[in-house]
Amino acid sequence: MVPAGVDPAAFDAFDMQALDAGTFDAAIDGAGDALAVVFFWGVDCFNCEIAKKAMLAQSDAIRALDLKWFHCNVYEHHQLGRRFGLHGVPTWFFFHRGKRLGRATGWHGLAQFQAAVSAARAKAAAAAIR
């Protein structure tokens, strides 16, 4: 559930599943072979709103990345912020088969986000070869 006053458009557009400490591990494991990404955000976070708007403005390119999306309000779920050592939001963590592959901190444009996704896919591919 999204708190009152938070625009859910990006969460809805990318079919992001909300996570908390109780659902996190099972949801990430349940993503299976998909490259999963968790969007960590906070209420009244200006940069989070900028990121969501930018993602919506380039929604076709974001969808083309073929990600399984999740989101977590770390202002509400502090334990996940601590677990992942977050010092600021927005932050995206990438997972494959339950393994953390990397992160992107701050929205620095589509090209940088695409590069982070590519790096995560390369790590997933390298792990599959071993």
Q: Where are the predicted features?
A:
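Short hydrophobic/charged patches on amphipathic alpha-helices used for structural packing
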Residues: D25, H78-G81
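Short active-site neighborhood of thiol/selenol oxidoreductases, capturing the structured segment around
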Residues: A31-D44
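N-terminal leader/targeting and pre-domain segments
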Residues: M1-A34, A116-R130
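Typically the conserved alpha-helix immediately C-terminal to a functionally engaged Cys/Sec
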Residues: E49-R63
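A short glycine-leucine-enriched loop at secondary-structure breakpoints
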Residues: R83-H87
